[in-house]
Amino acid sequence: MNLFSFLGDMLHLGSMLILLFKIKNDKSCAGVSLKSQILFTIVFTARYLDLFTNYVSLYITFMKITYIAVSYYTLHLIARKYKFTYDKDHDTFKIVYLIASCAILSLITYDKTTIGIYSTFLEILWTFSIYLESIAILPQLILLQRTGEVEALTSNYIVLLGGYRAFYLFNWIYRITFYNWSGKIEMLSGLLQTILYADFFYYYAKSRMYGKKLVLPQ
C-alpha cells in the first residue's frame, strides 16, 4: 500500500458514509439509485469473497469487512426501511445487461495462469468485480440526469467516488513507474470509470464556481 491507495480508500469509505448519513438524516433515499447500490454490493461481495482465505493485513481485512457491511446496510435502507421514498419511476436502468456483459468479459480475460479450481474461481470473480465497478455508477448518473436537480450530499457522494478513482489511477501510475506493475484490466476499467464521471464533474465544478445548485441537463 502507498499514500495514493490509502487516500483513495479513505475517499471511497467517505463517499459510502456520506451516502449513509444522507439517507439516515433525511429518512429518505430520494435521488439515490437502488440499481447502482445493488451493483456496488455485488462488486464488494465478488471481490472480497476471499475474506477468510486470503489474509494480507489487518487494514485490508478491516476495509473489506467495512465495505461489505456498509454496502449491505445501505441496500437495506433503500430497499426496505425507506422504500416508500425510493424513486422507482426514474431508476429503471436494466442492470442485468451490465452484469451479464461483465460476467462474460471476465470469463474471457481473467488471468489464465491461476492454478486450482478455487483460485481460478476467485480470480474470475475479482476480474468481474473490476469490470462491474467501472460502470456501476451508470444507473445513478442516469437517475440524476432524469430528475435534474442534485442534492448537495448526493453530489458530494459522487465527487468523493470520483476522487477515489483518481487517486487509484495515481496509485497505478506509481506502481508501474517504480515496481514494473502490469494491471491492464484495472487501468482500462479505471479510465472508463473516470470518463463516466467527467461530465458530472464539469457541471459540479460549474455550479460551485457560480455558487448555484447543481442541475444536470435532461
Swiss-Prot record:
Ranges in the topological domain labelled Cytoplasmic: 24-57, 116-123, 174-184
Annotated localization: Endoplasmic reticulum membrane
Entry-linked Pfam families: ER_lumen_recept
Lumenal compartment residues: 1-2, 79-94, 145-152, 206-218
Transmembrane segments: 3-23, 58-78, 95-115, 124-144, 153-173, 185-205
Entry keywords, A to Z: Endoplasmic reticulum, ER-Golgi transport, Membrane, Protein transport, Receptor, Transmembrane, Transmembrane helix, Transport
GO cellular component, one term: endoplasmic reticulum
MF GO annotations: ER retention sequence binding
GO biological process: one example: protein retention in ER lumen
Mode of membrane association: Multi-pass membrane protein
Superkingdom as given in the UniProt entry: Eukaryota
InterPro entries: ER_ret_rcpt
Family that this chain belongs to: Belongs to the ERD2 family.
PANTHER family per record: ER LUMEN PROTEIN RETAINING RECEPTOR
Function: Required for the retention of luminal endoplasmic reticulum proteins. Determines the specificity of the luminal ER protein retention system. Also required for normal vesicular traffic through the Golgi.
Name this polypeptide is given: ER lumen protein-retaining receptor
Organism: Dictyostelium discoideum (Social amoeba)
Organismal lineage: Eukaryota, Amoebozoa, Evosea, Eumycetozoa, Dictyostelia
